[in-house]
């Protein structure tokens, strides 16, 4: 029978409800587009690509969504990707009760989908989960991992079923750098790094293992090490407690060796390409969405402040410029970085 850990019929766009604070937090961090999915189950259905718009509804945006000024105007692409994981999620069924069981159920489901698809017109029943696994197979396939081993486990499934996964990393990829590089697959990296170990209590300090200390030291360099190894990367805010910690986390990755250009690409052109949206997102070009950032300095510098974020041609003030008594005349050069 059906297993509740298989939720391929979930459509994140159908569950999205606009929240002003949610949208504002992403705008203040400089985001013009956000990819979101329902993080529940082994097969998680489709994600939605959203624009974190404000309460204003410009006519130009409204014209694209004749349904009205509701959630639709936030949606850049209703189904932007299919998501998978080794996590059972909220299912209350006994099975699966282990990682091995999760892998077995995922493989069995993919075999079932192959059989179901092969029946063609002879099929006299409908299975929504299997229908949706097949229907979503043409979208980018994202696999969410939780540790350094999950990518290797998931890649075996990818080869078994002739799939290509984009991996949402755990932050531990540097530990298996050669193996990850050999896969040749993109990795979306989190920016949540370990807290500084508390060594003030000698007794507690003895319980902190060497592995924990090494991970605390090396985790910020994860992105830099993968890029130097030639692994395509994107960066995600997923895992951060607050969006206002995002810029500091990127700065930490840059301080650990990630170049500014690689950091910028990992937040603009690369994610747009992975989502198949690079014809309208990720760079400043004719025909692209007018998503721009106006900042006081080069992005991610310690003293850089985002002043205005433009989304679909609509300006959203973030922090006003300091008041100046006069306007200085002269010739100026406009220079900008795009954060999609």
Protein language model regions, located:
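His/Asp/Glu-enriched, well-ordered alpha-helical/loop segment
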Residues: 7-9, 140, 186-295
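Polyanionic/metal-chelating signatures
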Residues: 19-174, 305, 311, 328
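Anion (oxyanion) recognition and catalysis
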Residues: 27, 159, 181, 227, ...
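Short, charged, surface-exposed secondary-structure boundary motifs
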Residues: 61, 176-179, 196-203, 319
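Glycine-enriched alpha-helix->loop->beta-strand junction motifs that scaffold or abut catalytic
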Residues: 158-164, 181-188, 230-232
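C-terminal cap of metal-dependent C-N hydrolases
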Residues: 289-322
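Tryptophan-anchored aromatic micro-motifs
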Residues: 324-339
């Amino acid at each position: 029978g059906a297993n509740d850990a298989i939720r391929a019929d979930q459509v994140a766009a159908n569950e999205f409800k606009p929240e002003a604070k949610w949208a504002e937090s992403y705008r203040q961090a400089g985001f013009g587009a956000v990819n979101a999915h329902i993080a529940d189950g082994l097969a998680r259905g489709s994600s939605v690509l959203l624009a974190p718009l404000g309460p204003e509804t410009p006519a130009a945006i409204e014209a694209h969504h004749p349904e009205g000024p509701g959630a639709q105007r936030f949606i850049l692409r209703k189904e932007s990707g299919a998501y998978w994981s080794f996590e059972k999620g909220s299912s209350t069924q006994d099975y699966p009760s282990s990682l091995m069981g999760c892998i077995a159920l995922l493989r069995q489901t993919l075999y079932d989908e192959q059989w179901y698809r092969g029946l063609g017109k002879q099929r006299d029943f409908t299975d929504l989960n299997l229908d949706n696994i097949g229907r979503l197979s043409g979208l980018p396939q994202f696999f969410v991992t939780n540790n350094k081993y999950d990518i290797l486990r998931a890649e075996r499934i990818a080869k078994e079923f002739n799939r290509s996964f984009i991996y949402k990393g755990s932050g531990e990829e540097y530990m298996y750098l050669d193996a990850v590089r050999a896969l040749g697959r993109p990795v979306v990296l989190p920016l949540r790094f370990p807290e500084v170990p508390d060594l003030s209590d000698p007794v507690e300090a003895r319980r902190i293992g060497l592995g924990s200390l090494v991970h605390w030291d090396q985790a910020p360099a994860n992105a830099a090490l993968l890029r130097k190894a030639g692994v395509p990367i994107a960066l995600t805010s997923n895992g951060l407690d607050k969006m206002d910690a995002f810029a500091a986390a990127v700065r930490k990755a840059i301080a650990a060796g990630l170049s500014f250009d690689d950091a910028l690409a990992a937040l603009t052109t690369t994610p747009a390409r992975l989502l198949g949206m690079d014809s309208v997102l990720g760079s400043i070009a004719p025909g692209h969405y007018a998503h721009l950032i106006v900042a006081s300095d080069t992005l991610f510098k310690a003293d850089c402040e985002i002043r205005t974020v433009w989304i679909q041609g609509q300006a959203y003030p973030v922090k006003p410029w300091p008041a100046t008594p006069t306007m200085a005349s002269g010739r100026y050069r406009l220079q900008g970085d795009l954060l999609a």
